[in-house]
């Protein structure tokens, strides 16, 4: 019988030595774990602090300023009111939890077919701060923070903006410093203050878009933020216009527009050094001369199946959004709102290099018949860009909050003609 040879190495180590080695390894592991945890904890605390007082933004055709400073997603808890009478005697109302959201609930107008619903709080607006409300809804003095476009308060002082313009010849860069604003109006009746920030765009190309940080509860904000735009020849400065949009941050809805400042660089000569300017903030002119194009959509409702079919057919005459003048890459995003809450969102495929895209894409939504008066459908035509942020070309709203005659008529025909597809062209409005 052959002898079996054990080829495994043998280790003659004392149990005491092995125990000491194991204890040492354990101590090292615990120490490393504690060190890593402390570093992560300190880094998390630093992120929660306010941003530094002054930013230097180095841009080359794109905005690198962190959008998360003012565009964090806020979630408002929604609950059902079991005690409220609601519409038709037994329907429950959709309410915003005022205790957690910081909002005061308001009573619905018992008159009209839309009482008991919160569709008058739909977060879709004509502009940054102008909500679309149904005709039967009236505003009390404490409910609105913005002035209606038809308000007689046309001569209200909106404050002033101070900034400077400079040009770096070696780097061929335009340097704009937003310094401060004075005398801003109160946009929040509860705090008697405002949370201002500024968006700046270089017209007419709209390729350079930046914004400052939000300064809380102040009517005289000091931003002191510098933005550097590379790749702008000095010879082209005379054709450019600086557009400053002054806004107030709103955590519960779209930010409110305070006003705007338009500065043509044709009258500014930064060749000899920094030029400091102060301009009055004026009411924003929402009547834009540029056409946003048209969108054709088809809607049909099946009352038996309680199903809404939305078909995005095509668009035409879309504006060129690229500085190079090339055709865009449009797609359509469809948002469905029930009252204040968005209940569905979908989008079409991107159509490459065209200003007259044909989509022919359908989306189906299960919507009970009794909820139709509270439903609004928002269509956003968006220009896709691989290098910069996608830009909204225009918007269309159908439903109870449609502000255009064609939109209201389209929705009425859909509700009055069940099982029949109704297709119409609509002009897009500015987002």
From Swiss-Prot:
Stated name of the protein: Synaptotagmin-11
Residues the entry annotates as binding Ca(2+): 250, 253, 256
Subcellular location: Cytoplasmic vesicle membrane; Perikaryon; Golgi apparatus, trans-Golgi network membrane; Recycling endosome membrane
Gene Ontology biological process terms, A to Z: autophagy; calcium ion regulated lysosome exocytosis; calcium-dependent activation of synaptic vesicle fusion; establishment of vesicle localization; learning; memory; negative regulation of cytokine production; negative regulation of dopamine secretion
Residues in the Vesicular compartment per record: 1-15
Keywords tagged on the record: Calcium, Cell projection, Cytoplasmic vesicle, Endosome, Golgi apparatus, Lysosome, Membrane, Metal-binding, Phosphoprotein, Repeat, Synapse, Transmembrane, Transmembrane helix, Ubl conjugation
Membrane topology classification: Single-pass membrane protein
Homology family: Belongs to the synaptotagmin family.
A Gene Ontology cellular-component term: presynapse
Gene3D superfamilies per record: C2 domain (2.60.40.150)
KW Repeat (keyword) present: yes
Cytoplasmic side: 37-431
MF GO annotations: beta-tubulin binding; calcium ion sensor activity; calcium-dependent phospholipid binding; identical protein binding; metal ion binding; SNARE binding; translation initiation factor binding; ubiquitin protein ligase binding
Cofactors named for this entry: Ca(2+)
C2 domain span: 157-279, 291-426
């Amino acid at each position: 019988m052959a002898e079996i040879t054990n080829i495994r190495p043998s280790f003659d180590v004392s149990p005491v030595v092995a125990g000491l080695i194991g204890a040492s390894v354990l101590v090292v592991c615990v120490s490393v774990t504690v060190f890593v945890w402390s570093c992560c904890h300190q880094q998390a605390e630093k992120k929660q602090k306010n941003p530094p007082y002054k930013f230097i933004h180095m841009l080359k055709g794109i905005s690198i300023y962190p959008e998360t400073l003012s565009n964090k997603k806020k979630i408002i808890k929604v609950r059902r009111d079991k005690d409220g009478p609601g519409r038709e005697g037994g329907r429950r109302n959709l309410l915003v939890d005022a205790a957690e959201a910081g909002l005061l609930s308001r009573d619905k107008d018992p008159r009209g077919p839309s009482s008991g619903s919160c569709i008058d709080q739909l977060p879709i607006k004509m502009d940054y701060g102008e909500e679309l409300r149904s005709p039967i809804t009236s505003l009390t003095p404490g409910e609105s923070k913005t002035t209606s476009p038809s308000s007689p308060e046309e001569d209200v002082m909106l404050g002033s903006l101070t900034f400077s313009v400079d040009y770096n010849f070696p780097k061929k860069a335009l340097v704009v410093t937003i310094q401060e604003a004075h005398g801003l109006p109160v946009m929040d009746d509860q705090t008697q203050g405002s949370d201002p920030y500024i968006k700046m765009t270089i017209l007419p190309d709209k390729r350079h878009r930046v914004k400052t940080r939000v300064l809380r509860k102040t009517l005289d904000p000091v931003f002191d933020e510098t933005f550097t735009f590379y790749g702008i020849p000095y010879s082209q400065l005379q054709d450019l216009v600086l557009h400053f949009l002054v806004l107030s941050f709103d955590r519960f809805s779209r930010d409110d527009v305070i006003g705007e400042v338009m500065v043509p660089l044709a009258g500014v000569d930064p060749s000899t050094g920094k030029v400091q300017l102060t301009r009055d903030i004026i009411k924003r002119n929402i009547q834009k001369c540029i056409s946003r194009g048209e969108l054709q959509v088809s809607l049909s409702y099946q009352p038996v199946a309680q199903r809404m079919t939305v078909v995005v057919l095509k668009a035409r005459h879309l504006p060129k959004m690229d500085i190079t003048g090339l055709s865009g890459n449009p797609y359509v995003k469809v948002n469905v709102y029930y009252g204040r809450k968005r209940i569905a969102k979908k989008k079409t495929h991107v159509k490459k290099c065209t200003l007259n895209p044909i989509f022919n894409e359908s989306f189906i939504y299960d919507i009970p018949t009794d909820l139709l008066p509270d439903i609004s459908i928002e269509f956003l035509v968006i220009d896709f860009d691989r290098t910069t942020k996608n830009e909204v070309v225009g918007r269309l709203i159908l439903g109870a909050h449609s502000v255009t005659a064609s939109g209201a008529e389209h929705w009425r025909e859909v509700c009055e003609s069940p099982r029949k597809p109704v297709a119409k062209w609509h002009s897009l409005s500015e987002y």
